[in-house]
Structure formats: C-alpha cells, structure tokens
Amino acid sequence: MSANTQDNQANNNDTIEIQETEVVPVETNSLQSGLTSLTPMVLIFAVFYFLLLRPQEKRRKEREKLVSEVKKGEEVLTNSGIYGIVTKVSENDNNIEIEIAKDVRIKALKSAIVDITSRTKEVAVKKENNKKDKKVSGAKSS
C-alpha cells in the first residue's frame, strides 16, 4: 500500500500546473469615485434644506416679528383659542395682559399669541374693498 500511495502522490505532483495570467493595469480615480458617491447625499440635503428647513425658519422669523410688534388695544388670538384685546404689554418680562370679557383679564406670554386678528380683519377689509372697486370700475367702463 505504501508503494501505491507513493505513486498517487507522484501522480498528484505531476498534475499540478500553474497558469500564468496577463495582468492588465486598471486605472481608477479614487477622487472621482468618492465624489460620485457623495453627490446624491449632497443633493438630498439641498432638497431637504430648501423644502423643509428654510420655510420653517422664515415662518419662525415672521412669528417673532408679529409677537414683538403687538400693541395695546389690538385684538389677538392665543394658542389656546382665546380671543381678547391686549390691555397691557410688558416689555421686560415678555408678558401681556388680555381682556377676554368685560372686567376679565388674563396674563399670558407673548409667545402664546397665534394671530393679531385686528390686523387680519383690516387686511381682509382692504382686499374686499379692492375687489368691489375693480367690479365698479369694470362696470363703468362697459
């Protein structure tokens, strides 16, 4: 058996061949491949910024401006749904006093103001008057 195993080992040694292959150099630009993989992420972030973050920041600035410009005598709507008239504006502690009924006043934070309804009404009346003026001028010219 030992002679048989030696013959098998000799046959196995004879059958091992090493094939040589031609090596072709592949040029890769690592900078370019890195940029192409980053491009979609940059585009997604840009879309996210312009569709979500920028409008939200704009609304926040408008709201801060609205709250800072509230004056005594204006009708306001609070975030809890209470309508009232501003009777006192305190600049130093960011509070306002709102009269919600005759001789019923509440203290609230300026940040609780959602809308200044007296200004909204003025804008609505102006728009309505402009529409009426356009209809009247259109009827006169006919």
UniProtKB/Swiss-Prot annotation:
Signal peptide: none
Subcellular location: Cell inner membrane
Database matches in InterPro entries: Preprotein_translocase_YajC
Domain of life: Bacteria
A Gene Ontology cellular-component term: plasma membrane
Cross-referenced SMART domains: YajC (SM01323)
Keywords, comma-separated and alphabetical: Cell inner membrane, Cell membrane, Membrane, Protein transport, Translocation, Transmembrane, Transmembrane helix, Transport
Bilayer topology term: Single-pass membrane protein
One Gene Ontology biological process: protein transport
Membrane-crossing segments per the record: 33-53
Family indicated by similarity: Belongs to the YajC family.
PANTHER family: SEC TRANSLOCON ACCESSORY COMPLEX SUBUNIT YAJC (PTHR33909:SF1)
Quaternary assembly: Part of the SecDF-YidC-YajC translocase complex. The SecDF-YidC-YajC translocase forms a supercomplex with SecYEG, called the holo-translocon (HTL).
Function, in words: The SecYEG-SecDF-YajC-YidC holo-translocon (HTL) protein secretase/insertase is a supercomplex required for protein secretion, insertion of proteins into membranes, and assembly of membrane protein complexes. While the SecYEG complex is essential for assembly of a number of proteins and complexes, the SecDF-YajC-YidC subcomplex facilitates these functions.
Record protein name field: Sec translocon accessory complex subunit YajC
Gene: yajC
